């Protein structure tokens, strides 16, 4: 059994969709219907034809000027100045790109940049997103509608107009071909969601089928709320009486969480596209240690207080001999203070390397798993 708490409504939706029960035939049927509508929409535009021509032009150009493995070897040996050479070749390819854009009448930018969806998506992609979203609205089954909404959100997260090197930390929207330091060649932004939509529909269905076979007869639910003040059992009672009775009788064995670290991430902003599209209410002001507040002395104090309040609130719902595991790269050494504030002691620390990072920065990075327990009076 598990209870999650998240201040972000969208994150709670993701969590709940992972464990929800579905009519998988209905999910497959609706995916097929929407994919057909998307392909029909694309057949009436020149987007795919444009992309095909562009990919061929890029293939020829990159083979000539960024041959594998010669280019990467020369770059490593310092025989090529990557910044100068990359910028020069980026400029050389631009006329080819612009000619194709004109030929196929591709609209690179939207008319306004008011919202995240306006700014970070080309007009073609925005039109496709709106089409799929309109089709999702027609779905009758609520569970099916939710999981396909998540598939669309995964798709649009992968289709933002950014360079491959800046996927994790958006810098400026990209509307043309560019030299890509991550791949060592000229790359392009996306002009259609079709590829990623296809990837994520297949991936999600495979995960749902697999999880259905592994599922146990247990309860899981992710609540939307502020962990510092939420009445966990009261909120569960509103949604599932059986689960609430079980939780109140047995209490909670422990916590496993990876809280955002101070000044590292704006939690709601990382999913701004979903808040724009689905209209969820944002609660940015309730975030603990957001990026926009920085890492100054006041921010650290506020973070320590916030995490301490979470632990003190949640303790009320735990068994006496609880175990808490918190994951953090605690470079400011705040967790010993947090543990003390919550009447806990750190009984063990586990070091964990962080692999498979999205960004170009692949530097060594490790986190600590803090194992905390109630301070013993003996």
List where the protein language model places each region.
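Acceptor-substrate binding/catalytic loop of class I
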Residues: 116-120, 297-303, 324-330
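Conserved S-adenosyl-L-methionine
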Residues: 1-43, 182-231, 254-283, 321, ...
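Conserved phosphoryl-transfer catalytic core
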Residues: 13-121, 128, 132-135, 280-293
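SAM-dependent nucleic-acid methyltransferase catalytic core
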Residues: 94-255, 262
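Class I S-adenosyl-L-methionine
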Residues: 329-378
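Short glycine-centered segments of the SAM/dcSAM-binding site in methyltransferase folds
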Residues: 147, 321-323
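SAM-dependent methyltransferase catalytic-core segment centered on the flexible catalytic loop
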Residues: 230-255, 260-320
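S-adenosyl-L-methionine
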Residues: 1, 15, 148, 315, ...
């Amino acid at each position: 059994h598990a209870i999650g708490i998240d201040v972000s409504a969208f994150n709670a939706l993701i969590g709940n969709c992972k464990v929800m029960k579905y009519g998988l035939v209905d999910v497959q049927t609706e995916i097929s219907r929407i994919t057909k509508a998307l392909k029909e929409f694309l057949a009436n535009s020149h987007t795919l034809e444009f992309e095909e021509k562009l990919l061929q032009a890029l293939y020829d150009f990159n083979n000539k000027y960024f041959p594998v493995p010669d280019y990467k070897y020369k770059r490593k040996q310092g025989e090529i100045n990557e910044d100068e050479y990359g910028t020069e070749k980026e400029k050389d390819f631009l006329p080819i790109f612009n000619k194709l854009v004109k030929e196929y009448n591709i609209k690179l930018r939207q008319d306004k940049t008011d919202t995240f969806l306006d700014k970070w998506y080309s007009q073609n992609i925005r039109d496709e997103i709106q089409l799929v979203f309109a089709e999702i609205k027609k779905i009758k089954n609520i569970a099916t509608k939710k999981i396909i909404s998540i598939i669309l959100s995964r798709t649009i997260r992968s289709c933002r107009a950014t360079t491959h090197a800046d996927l994790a930390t958006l810098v400026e929207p990209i509307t043309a071909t560019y030299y890509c330091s991550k791949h060592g060649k000229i790359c392009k932004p996306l002009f259609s969601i079709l590829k990623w939509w296809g990837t994520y529909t297949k991936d999600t269905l495979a995960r749902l089928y697999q999880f259905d076979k592994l599922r146990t007869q247990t309860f899981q639910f992710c609540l939307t709320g502020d962990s510092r003040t939420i009445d966990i059992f009261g909120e569960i009672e509103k949604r599932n009486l059986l689960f609430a009775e079980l939780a109140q009788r047995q209490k909670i064995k422990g916590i496993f969480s990876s809280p955002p670290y101070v000044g590292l991430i704006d939690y709601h902003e990382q999913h701004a596209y979903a808040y724009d599209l689905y209209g969820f209410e944002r609660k940015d002001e309730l975030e603990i240690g957001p990026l926009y507040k920085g890492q100054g002395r006041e921010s650290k104090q506020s973070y320590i207080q916030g995490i301490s309040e979470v632990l003190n609130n949640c303790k009320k719902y735990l068994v006496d001999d609880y175990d808490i595991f918190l994951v953090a790269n605690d470079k400011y050494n705040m967790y010993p203070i947090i543990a003390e504030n919550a009447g806990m002691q750190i009984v063990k620390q586990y070091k964990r390397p962080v692999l498979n990072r999205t960004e170009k920065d692949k530097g060594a990075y490790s986190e600590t798993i803090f194992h905390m327990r109630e301070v013993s009076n003996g």
